[in-house]
């Protein structure tokens, strides 16, 4: 059973939405669920080095890298690279896969569950 998490929000926007999505991804993976993450809109900053978390806030870029290191595939909207996030135009770090809407569509179609954050 595959679960796709689509993230949209900026990592450090004053809410816990993105943080909770990453926590859920970690727990699902730990529970043996096949987890996939697709980053679009301002959430693409999770795939970029250079974002410093505010004091007292967990480093969500590090959380994303840890998920990748554990084998969770993370694909990142290519169009959003130029248009979205605090670091517009900055490339993505190794392990975060540059992707397309067609690949997002394929993941949606082949996933048992799709959750959006």
Summary of predicted features, one role per range:
Residues 3-19, 47-52:
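Short, glycine-rich nucleotide/cofactor-binding loops
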Residues 44-47, 83-84:
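Short, active-site-adjacent cap segments at secondary-structure transitions
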Residues 84-117:
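C-terminal structural segments of small proteins and small subunits
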Residues 17-30, 37:
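Histidine-anchored nucleotide/phosphate-binding helix
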Residues 25, 35-40, 74-78:
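Short internal beta-strands
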Residues 53-81:
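A glycine-rich helix N-cap at a beta->alpha junction
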Residues 2, 30-36, 73:
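Residues at the starts of beta-strands that form the adenosine-phosphate
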Residues 50-55, 91-94:
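Short glycine-enriched, charge-decorated loop/helix-capping segments at active-site entrances
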């Amino acid at each position: 059973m595959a679960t796709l998490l689509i993230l949209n929000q900026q990592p450090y926007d004053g809410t816990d939405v993105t943080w909770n999505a990453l926590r859920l991804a970690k727990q699902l993976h730990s529970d043996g669920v096949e987890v996939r993450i697709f980053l679009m809109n301002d959430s693409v900053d999770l795939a970029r080095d250079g974002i410093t978390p505010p004091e007292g806030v967990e480093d969500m870029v590090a959380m994303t890298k840890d998920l990748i290191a554990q084998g969770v595939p993370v694909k990142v909207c290519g169009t959003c690279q130029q248009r979205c996030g605090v670091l517009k135009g900055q490339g993505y770090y190794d392990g975060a896969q540059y992707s397309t809407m067609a690949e997002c569509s394929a993941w949606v179609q082949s996933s048992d569950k799709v959750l959006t954050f």
